[in-house]
């Protein structure tokens, strides 16, 4: 509470003596190796897209400018030009083109569609998904969807990217919604 009253938002461009302590705390809490804090959800998703593409070119060996990221119909990841490029919301898209290429849309909560998209090309870099879709009308996937989607991504060397902006930090009863059925020791609250 005291910190929230002193400084709640800062950029990594400016030094503060709390960021390192926060990063240590949050990585230990979630069992992560690293964290890159962002100020907004759209900034977090844009950064995830950039990291995914960079990884695809430098680690997976996809030819430059050929990486594809799978996204779901009915998604809401923000309102930036890149993000609206793969949105179904015509109110968000109208008169903002041309749009950013490099995305494949599939049905949400459809493992067959995900597998078909992943195996359709050697240029698949990542799968960006909301653990619970909010913009589409609060759509909760089947109980095994996220775990099976992650396993499918791992089996095909595709990054699994969960957008927890609207669902994370215990908003769904789990620290992370993607861990709703988690049994990972020291990785979440269960």
Residue ranges of model-derived segments:
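Conserved N-terminal phosphate-binding loop of PLP-dependent enzymes in the Aspartate aminotransferase
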Residues: 1-190
